Amino acid sequence: TKFASNLHEPLGMFWKDGSLFATQRPEHTRLTDKDGDGRADSFDTICSKWGISGDYHEYAFGSDPDKNGDVWMVLCLTGSFHAHAPWRGWAAKITPEGKFIPVASGIRSPGGIGANDRGDFFYTDNQGVWNGSSSLKWLRAGSFQGNPTGNKSAALANFPTPPEPTSGSRTLAERLKFPEYVPPALILPHGKVGNSPSGVACDMSKGKFGPWESHMLIGEQTASQVQRVNLEVVNGLYQGAVFHFLGGFEAGLIPVRMDQEDGTLFIGGSNRGWGSRGSKNFTFERVRFKGKV
């Protein structure tokens, strides 16, 4: 049943207090059915503090609310080399009242965002400038994620401007120069574990999805797969390992969500604008644990 239409590429949705909340390209929106006919008739802008320039690449990915009710979001750069609008290449929180709070800089091309069982937020960043291979990154508050393109918004955030990383340098050397730099929790070998990671989910179903409690699940658009990630904290930073997990989906995977009540994994797919192993234009698929590994 259609609830709403004409949204601008929403890449993050959740229900709360009888309304549907959507992170769209230009704004975070509350959609409400006030007359009870099953269709949204009230569209309220909660926050629209970031900028867009019209470039196709300027996606906005939003999370479910955290324990404080804040929505975390990551904002793509303008293409691969520019930040033509405010807050491009940044992560931020949106409070229930609509306040925009910058959280981290240094982002390139996110494909999804989600929290682990500790409530820490992670996003997938795609291979390209300053990202030798795609990765899963921890959004520690106040951190720099490695790509300096969006540094021009640091003054707006009252953040220290990170120095330009040295091409060909090493993570340890760059962290000594700028301790706010947080290296990837996990690097995804390009071509071996896909080329374009997307949605992020965490298995907190207490065994309903199998023996992978607290593991992260990330989508892969090019290869039409789901990868499984096991993380640990060492010396205050996340690190971990990635495993091929599920394949054979019918389009490129974008959102990945788990129903923690019954352990069903829901996956949305599309090959619009980016080729994928799955050949369908749009899909909605689900995965349930059969009881065997």
Model region roles, listed by residue range:
Residues 1-293:
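Beta-propeller domains with acidic blade repeats across secreted/periplasmic ectodomains
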